[in-house]
């Protein structure tokens, strides 16, 4: 992958994943995000540290399978490919995913 400019770092984080399993992982300081398929762990680590001002200990990545979708009556297409990134933070850092109002 080409060198990433710091202004492009927020584009590497597509969204956070909120499911029952990922909420349980929050107790152990593991946060789950979606990223584009071509992003490396090093670039994603820089994006998380720059955007949330936290220290990342480790990152695990999973390539999600390609999903098929019907387009019209006979044709099939595919949905965009994503990578799931599980980020483990330092013990003193947190990311506030839920807004308290």
UniProtKB/Swiss-Prot annotation:
Gene Ontology MF terms: rRNA binding; structural constituent of ribosome
Main localization, broad class: plastid
Subcellular location: Plastid, Chloroplast
A biological-process GO annotation: translation
A Pfam family that the UniProt record links to this protein: Ribosomal_L23
InterPro entries, sorted: Nucleotide-bd_a/b_plait_sf (IPR012677), Ribosomal_uL23-like (IPR013025), Ribosomal_uL23/eL15/eS24_sf (IPR012678)
An annotated GO cellular component: ribonucleoprotein complex
Protein origin, superkingdom: Eukaryota
Keywords in alphabetical order: Chloroplast, Plastid, Ribonucleoprotein, Ribosomal protein, RNA-binding, rRNA-binding
Subunit details: Part of the 50S ribosomal subunit.
HAMAP family with a match to the protein in the record: Ribosomal_uL23_B
Family per similarity comment: Belongs to the universal ribosomal protein uL23 family.
Functional description taken from the UniProt entry: Binds to 23S rRNA.
Name of the molecule in the record: Large ribosomal subunit protein uL23c
């Amino acid at each position: 992958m080409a060198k990433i400019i710091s202004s492009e770092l927020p584009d590497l984080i597509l969204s956070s994943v909120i499911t029952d399993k990922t909420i349980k992982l929050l107790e152990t300081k593991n946060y789950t995000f979606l990223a584009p398929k071509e992003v490396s762990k090093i670039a994603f680590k820089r994006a998380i540290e720059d955007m949330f001002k936290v220290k990342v200990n480790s990152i695990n990545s999973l390539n999600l399978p390609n999903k098929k979708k019907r387009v019209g009556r006979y044709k099939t297409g595919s949905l965009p490919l994503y990578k799931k990134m599980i980020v483990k933070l330092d013990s003193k850092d947190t990311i506030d995913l839920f807004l308290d109002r």
